Each structure stands twice: as structure tokens, then as C-alpha cells.
UniProtKB/Swiss-Prot annotation:
CDD domains: somatotropin_like. It is found in: Secreted. GO terms for cellular component: extracellular space. This is Somatotropin. Plays an important role in growth control. Its major role in stimulating body growth is to stimulate the liver and other tissues to secrete IGF1. It stimulates both the differentiation and proliferation of myoblasts. It also stimulates amino acid uptake and protein synthesis in muscle and other tissues. One of its GO terms (molecular function) is metal ion binding. The modification Phosphoserine is found at S131. The keyword Protease does not apply. It comes from Sus scrofa. Gene3D superfamilies: 1.20.1250.10. It holds the Pfam family Hormone_1.
Amino acid sequence: MAAGPRTSALLAFALLCLPWTREVGAFPAMPLSSLFANAVLRAQHLHQLAADTYKEFERAYIPEGQRYSIQNAQAAFCFSETIPAPTGKDEAQQRSDVELLRFSLLLIQSWLGPVQFLSRVFTNSLVFGTSDRVYEKLKDLEEGIQALMRELEDGSPRAGQILKQTYDKFDTNLRSDDALLKNYGLLSCFKKDLHKAETYLRVMKCRRFVESSCAF
């Protein structure tokens, strides 16, 4: 019985290490269930990484007495709040899979630019020791979502909305209070957006493939 969790962890790690099939013609060779499983695992990994980073940054730079008021001020800060994306599991269940994939793609793409500056901000690895790989992880998830869109749209995806607006760059001047608050807000949005993307992918996976892990 003790081998169960270990086996599950090893399987999850193995799936995370699997690359997406790059050639369009080869996508049908990978079952849809595997595409969804890989996408969900990658989204979960990124969301956890973002949550851990936010907490570490908070502990390192934001006084405990100021956190609550700052978090309230950040409520309307995230760009993702300006697009008509579902805000939770219940709303996500009312949308089609293609809609949820498009929202997921928009959320991921909005961070491709800003995260390239993370390694310059956290050069001491105090907060984000793997920051130089976050861009690669986001690109990997982007490819997985695009693969799912091709599968669900019979290999001929319609021209989707192109995200023109994105988040600001992270500020490298950590001696400035304004810069610290800006980075704190960006990390909060990064965490929220990845949580949304993970939720959308899990909703789609669960309603297509009935599983015991669908309660979340």
C-alpha cells in the first residue's frame, strides 16, 4: 500500500518530462486523454510554482501588517479581470471546451513577456531559483493548449483572438517601495491567472474523462 503515492508521484514526474509532439501530423497519435493529462500536470506545476514564489516574496519583502490592505488594493489590478473569462469552477462548467482553451491560451500568453525578466529581478535565487525556466514552462503549456485546440477543432483551428495587452515587466529595483509593491501585485496576478488556467483544464478533463479526482 505504501508504494501507491510513490508510484503516482513517479508517474506524474514522467508525464511532466514528456515533450509535446511538435509535428502537426503526429498529434492524432497521442490520445486526447494524454494531451489533457499532460496539460493539467503542467498547469498544476506552474500554479504551485507561482504560489510558492508569491509566498516567498511576501515573506522576504512585505511587512506582515501591510499584507491584508495591499491584497485588497490588488483586487482589480489584474489585466485578466478585464476579459470575460470564468472566475471559478462553476462558471467554467457553463463554457464550451473550445472557449475554455482560448481563455487558457490568452492567460498563458499574457505572461510570456513579463516572466522573461524574472531572473533579472531575483538574481539571488532567494525567491525564484528556477525563474530562468519559467518562460520555457509557459511556452510548453502554450504548445499543449494549442495541440488540444487543434484536436478539438479537427486540425483546423479558427483564427482566435490575439492578445494585444499584456502585463508590465517586473521591476528590478528592489530598493524602491513602489517597485516592491508592483512586483508583489504582478506575482499575485501570475498566481491567480495560472489558477484559472489550471481550473479550466481540469474542468475540461473531468467532464470528458470521468475520474475520482474530479472533486476539486
